[in-house]
Amino acid sequence: MVLKTKENKKFDIYLKSSDFAVSKKASKLIKKLNKKHPKRKSLNSFEAKKYDIYFKEVCKAVTNGINNQLICNHINLKILPGEFVVILGKSGSGKTSLLSLISALDRPTSGDSFVCGTNTICCSDAKLTALRNKNVGYIFQQYGLLRDLDVDDNIKLALPLKKRFNNNLEELLERLELKEHRHKKVHKLSGGQQQRVAIARALIKEPKILFGDEPTGAVNIDISKKILQFFVEYNRDKGTTIVIVTHNEKIVELAKRVIKIHDGKIIVDYLNQNPKTIEQINWV
């Protein structure tokens, strides 16, 4: 979908100019779409505080300097504390763009977008960073570990210096079967062990929400099942909100809530009344 804006009309003039002028104008349009909005009172701020994520009519637009395109299209979404949510979509469906918004990695172009009670559309970059550091944990398909540091030090990197001694560390090492590897350099670990280190790093600060972007995409089925089992148990035991973004329809069967996205729109959103266990799912 293309948004027709005043900027688009003005841009026609620049198409007859030099390439430099076009590039300069395009840069300004991109900055305008991604800048923070002035503080404004939202009619939904009181209701939003009940949710970890509260989105109402949220849009995200990108530009090539000539046309603006919606990559997230009027998203309405409410996620309560403690939910286990799977967002399902094919490549190019907009699921990663949505993840960037609901995890406060990016600001929307319009709408009300509350993450842990904060309206992210009004936040400066510094405030978005503070919001993420306090409330959000991430697990990506690429682990982002420092290969020459050991397991302990990689995990502790997620903590402020004054909190490097953390009681949560021992529990995570135990639950993720990493205790015997804690002093090994991570480049000496298997792929599955490295993934578990990344999970521990995301959870060491005890975030309110854990986001996983294709968290099992780079490991085999056996390791995937162990990782997913950990998510299920952690959600049950700690009450941490977990949101997994994936193209794998098998993972949907574990979720308490399933959201499907296509062309930047939520097309399905339902509660799974009978989520399956790892053993009940046919992984073949």
UniProtKB/Swiss-Prot annotation:
Keywords of this entry: ATP-binding, Nucleotide-binding, Transport
Domain ABC transporter: 53-284
Pfam families with a match to the protein in the record: ABC_tran
InterPro entries in UniProt: AAA+_ATPase, ABC_transporter-like_ATP-bd, ABC_transporter-like_CS, MacB-like_ATP-bd, P-loop_NTPase
Domain of life: Bacteria
Record SMART domains: AAA
PANTHER family: ABC TRANSPORTER ATP-BINDING PROTEIN MG467-RELATED, LIPOPROTEIN-RELEASING SYSTEM ATP-BINDING PROTEIN LOLD
Family the UniProt entry places it in: Belongs to the ABC transporter superfamily.
Name the record gives this protein: Putative ABC transporter ATP-binding protein MG468.1
Organism: Mycoplasma genitalium (strain ATCC 33530 / DSM 19775 / NCTC 10195 / G37) (Mycoplasmoides genitalium)
